[in-house]
């Protein structure tokens, strides 16, 4: 970890600091923040800068706005929540690099905080546009990246911006350091048995991570919608369940590779099936290999939960990424919630990666019992795949 430039090494005294945070928080239809963990996680870095007499400019994205400003993606609510958590004013700019942001940034005094509007309201952000990055770099003499959740994206505020700072003026914040550290140790030195629990709807998003995990884990549990592609590759009847036809062969190879490496791979043995995905639809428990035509599996069933519970009972490390069913709807959330309970009942070091999985754990009331909840789903997957992340690479010390 020592090769990452750290905020501790910077001479910040009284400077203006630009911090890239990850305030991409879930909201309900009334734009109320339903989980502020990402906002709270950013506080140690912000406080450290304030304690060093700095003025602080904060930037983040929220959601995926398509064409410029959209009220539902405004960071105004985030600024209010942060202000409450810090118990001090957070000045809000109504644009990203427009007049309002520039005027307020110039007037910023030591100990003051300014949050600029959603970075993705600027088209150039997701294109890693250097002109935008240069404008953003003018907000601070120092650049701090504390947004692990976007480090796998080469975006203006994550990658291009680092070109405008030398080693003495850019670094990782405390949250980013903690996340990188944790992910790297987990992969290099897990306590064994090491069990990975992988869910979510798509195999495609997790394929590379599965290949990379297999040589490292002792057991692998596959749940969620992605399990059906694996069941299909074994010739089972999955009815109308989610299937990625083009990945059946890949699924077969992963199961084969598991055999060769002596890694036991567990799939659901029963599912909660329905004919349509709706709150009114009738449901029934059916064996995972005999889902009737016209029915689809939308959650793991009670026998699968019992099986998975046994599989993780002796684990010393559990890494969980992806829910076990369509947890957004109550009647298909039981598998994920019971999985969460089962994981905290073990004596293992428990690591949760990804927004959906973090939501499940929060909903299950288990967040405080997990050893570590990673704020970045895609980023933690890519670290596990052994990739160099575009947001982290420029923060490595030069040899």
Curated annotation (Swiss-Prot):
It comes from Campylobacter concisus (strain 13826). It comes from the Bacteria. One of its GO terms (cellular component) is cytosol. It holds the Pfam family PGK. Pathway: Carbohydrate degradation; glycolysis; pyruvate from D-glyceraldehyde 3-phosphate: step 2/5. Its main location: cytoplasm. This is Phosphoglycerate kinase. Belongs to the phosphoglycerate kinase family. The keyword Aminoacyl-tRNA synthetase does not apply. It is found in: Cytoplasm. InterPro entries: Phosphoglycerate_kinase, Phosphoglycerate_kinase_CS, Phosphoglycerate_kinase_N, Phosphoglycerate_kinase_sf. The lineage of its organism: Bacteria, Pseudomonadati, Campylobacterota, Epsilonproteobacteria, Campylobacterales. Monomer.
């Amino acid at each position: 970890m020592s090769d990452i430039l750290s905020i501790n090494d910077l001479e910040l005294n009284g400077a203006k600091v630009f911090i890239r945070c990850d305030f991409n928080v879930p909201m309900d239809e009334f734009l109320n923040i339903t989980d502020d963990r990402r906002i709270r996680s950013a506080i140690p870095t912000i406080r450290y800068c304030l304690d060093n007499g700095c003025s602080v400019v904060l930037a983040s994205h929220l959601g995926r706005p398509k064409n410029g400003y959209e009220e539902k993606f405004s960071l105004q609510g985030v600024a209010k929540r942060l202000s409450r958590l810090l118990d001090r004013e957070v000045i809000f700019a109504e644009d990203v690099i427009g007049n309002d942001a520039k005027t307020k940034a110039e007037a910023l005094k030591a100990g003051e905080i300014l949050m600029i509007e959603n970075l993705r309201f600027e088209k150039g952000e997701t294109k890693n546009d250097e002109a935008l990055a240069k404008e953003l770099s003018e907000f601070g003499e120092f650049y701090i990246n504390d947004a692990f959740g976007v480090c796998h994206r080469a975006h203006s505020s994550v990658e291009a911006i680092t070109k405008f700072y030398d080693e003495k003026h850019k670094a990782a914040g405390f949250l980013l350091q903690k996340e990188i550290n944790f992910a790297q140790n987990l992969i290099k030195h897990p306590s064994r048995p090491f069990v990975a629990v992988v869910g979510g709807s798509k195999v495609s998003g997790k394929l590379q991570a599965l290949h990379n995990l297999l040589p490292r884990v002792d057991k692998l549990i596959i749940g969620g919608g992605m399990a059906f592609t694996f069941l299909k590759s074994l010739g089972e009847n999955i009815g109308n369940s989610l299937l990625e036809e083009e990945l059946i062969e890949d699924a077969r190879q992963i199961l084969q590779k598991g055999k060769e490496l002596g890694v036991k791979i567990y799939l659901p043995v029963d599912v909660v099936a329905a004919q349509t995905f709706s709150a009114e639809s009738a449901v029934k428990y059916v064996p995972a290999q005999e889902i009737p035509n016209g029915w689809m599996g939308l959650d793991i069933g009670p026998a699968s939960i019992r099986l998975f519970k046994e599989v993780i009972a002796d684990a010393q490390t559990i890494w969980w990424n992806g829910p076990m069913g369509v947890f957004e709807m109550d009647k298909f959330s039981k598998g994920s919630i019971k999985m969460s309970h089962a994981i905290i009942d073990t004596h293992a070091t428990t690591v949760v990666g990804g927004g959906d999985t973090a939501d499940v754990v929060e909903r299950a009331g288990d967040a405080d019992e997990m050893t570590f909840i990673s704020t970045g789903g895609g980023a933690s997957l890519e670290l596990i795949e052994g990739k160099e992340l575009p947001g982290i690479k420029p923060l490595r010390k030069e040899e």
